[in-house]
């Protein structure tokens, strides 16, 4: 398939997912009692919101692991931790909020890491390793969850439990085969200037752990906001959350808005719609809007500081030149 065809197919898939999500949201939210949503918001225990916020902070802190692992994998180990933390937070938050995350995350990373003698090829390699970490974590989580609780997938894929369990075994088997392949010796992929050495067995296990922890922390943060329900456990929320975010990424919708909400409303019919909407509203505030505002402020402050520094240097150069002018 040629590049133009792939691009058109990608756009078509994105439009289809967003369109389906919009139709689903319209259908599920039609007739919803806004008063009950407000009442559910007011009734949400404050301690649950605080625990959810703490899990969100832990999840964003875990993002540093993505960039640190990628930087170590490409031999860039001299970047200060504060720079890595700043870059991972701002690139992920701004990139995934604007949509087209691969491009926007890369632009933010290049803007920061270019000051540390990194070129576009280095940024592409970082994107590859962070993407691998993310997908390995997702496959591991979904595979294990499908084996342990295959019924958690049923509301979304409408498949019988045994079929979902088979998919889970296939996912775990794929990871095991990948690990065995890596354990067979040094693995290098690519050609010419685009050649990278894949992490070894231990490194890949760490990579999977980073990705899994990311998914678990994020799903727990929304699970804490849901009212207690004996029919819904952590595993079910984890499954719905991972599938929802994957659909959001494929859709390229800014912040996956609408897509994630539609997936939750479909995947968790055990909850009253008003209670679920209230939980999603709170989750969006603490996991999306607040981090986005903070990331924009931090990035803008950095750019303003750099601009001020350049202006000061230009003024100093002008003064020096003037002092030597007869």
Residue spans for each PLM region:
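Predominantly cytoplasmic-facing regulatory/coupling regions of multi-pass membrane proteins
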Residues: 1-89, 138, 147-249, 271-280, ...
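Short amphipathic alpha-helical coupling elements at transmembrane boundaries
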Residues: 39-43, 72, 108-115, 125, ...
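Residues at alpha-helix boundaries and short interhelical turns
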Residues: 78, 97-98, 117, 216, ...
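Membrane-interface alpha-helices at helix entry/exit sites of multi-pass transporters
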Residues: 82-86, 101-104, 115-132, 272-282
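Transmembrane alpha-helix interface/packing and boundary motifs in multi-pass membrane proteins
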Residues: 90-99, 240-261
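Mid-bilayer segments of alpha-helical transmembrane spans in multi-pass integral membrane proteins
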Residues: 92-101, 131-143
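Re-entrant/interfacial helical elements at transmembrane boundaries that shape
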Residues: 102-115, 144, 254-269
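Internal, well-ordered alpha-helical segments in soluble enzyme and binding-protein domains
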Residues: 109, 119, 125-135, 139, ...
